Amino acid sequence: MAKVYATGRRKTSIAKVWLESGNGQLTINGQTLDAWLGGHESIKKRVMQPLNVAKQETSVNIIVKTLGGGYSAQADAARHGISRALVAFDEQFRTILKPYGLLTRDSRSVERKKFGKKKARKSSQFSKR
């Protein structure tokens, strides 16, 4: 089959994902998953979750380019992008991935700082007198 393109997002991170049928290779920013993340097993599991749920670990090749944010947000953006790419690759994966919430964009992001306050919600100490 042809290459499929999808994007995933989380916080300020964006992941561009290309998926094609193959033998299970996964490269993120030109590196293997182990080289990119080092010893973060929980983050590796999050990236691989859509492939594990859809049982496609060894049947597709994936190339991911990530921009912005930290490792955790980039990993979640990659997970979102891989899920969307699987659905674009074959529509039957939608019914498999949807119950796990893998196709839903996590809209939580940092709340902006307001003027007159120290942070988004933290006020300066109140003095009664």
Curated annotation (Swiss-Prot):
Alphabetized, the UniProt keywords read:
Ribonucleoprotein, Ribosomal protein
| Signal peptide segment | none
Ribonucleoprotein: is it a keyword of this entry?
yes
* GO CC aspect terms: cytosolic small ribosomal subunit
Q: Give the matching Pfam families.
A: Ribosomal_S9
Q: Where are the transmembrane segments?
A: none
Tell me one GO biological process term.
translation
- For whether the record's keyword set contains Magnesium, the answer is no
UniProt GO molecular function: RNA binding; structural constituent of ribosome
Going by the entry's taxonomy, the superkingdom of the source organism is recorded as Bacteria
Q: What PROSITE patterns does the record point to?
A: RIBOSOMAL_S9
Q: Which PANTHER family match?
A: RIBOSOMAL PROTEIN S9 (PTHR21569), SMALL RIBOSOMAL SUBUNIT PROTEIN US9M (PTHR21569:SF1)
Q: Which family does it belong to?
A: Belongs to the universal ribosomal protein uS9 family.
**Could you identify this protein by its name?**
Small ribosomal subunit protein uS9
Source organism of the structure = Aliarcobacter butzleri (strain RM4018) (Arcobacter butzleri)
Starting at the broadest rank, the lineage of the source organism is: Bacteria, Pseudomonadati, Campylobacterota, Epsilonproteobacteria, Campylobacterales
